[in-house]
């Protein structure tokens, strides 16, 4: 389910397409059904044994469209559906997706669903315009493999490693300090 806000779905669409390709290539996956938040039908949700929520975070939290889906599903009878999440954020640190992940975990716990894990993507908007796309593709492939095997997964990726981020930040601040004391 591409459950993000309508204006933000364009940013996660490439991740969705790549995930769909990898899931379709798995022999174990016999039915891939991609839904959008606006075409979502809560009556069919629990016909699937696995569901992946895919969205970009808004203010480090789940978008309102995803929360609306959660609310609709609360009244439905449940089976033991496995829930996965692909969460993208515009911040450099993939850890900015942690709050969204915890909300999904808590919702799954309350609704007696099995949360199997997530792929958290930091600096998603930059990745789409850079050569780093292939790195993310490898993580999406690993994520799809875990889904195909019904395994738990906890992956995170960002365009910048901590080391590169710190080096770039230090370079910037050193330059700013030199400007100030000239």
Can you say where each PLM-predicted feature lies in the sequence?
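Glycine-rich phosphate/pyrophosphate-binding loop and the adjoining helix
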Residues: 121-182
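A generic structural signal for short coil/turn motifs at secondary-structure boundaries
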Residues: 6-7, 92-95, 127-130
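N-terminal beta1-alpha1 ligand-phosphate binding loop
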Residues: 1-24
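Alpha-helical scaffold elements within enzyme catalytic domains, especially in hydrolases
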Residues: 18-21, 72, 107, 146
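Helix-loop-strand module that forms the ligand-binding subsite of alpha/beta enzymes
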Residues: 39-111
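A short, well-structured beta->alpha microelement
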Residues: 24-44
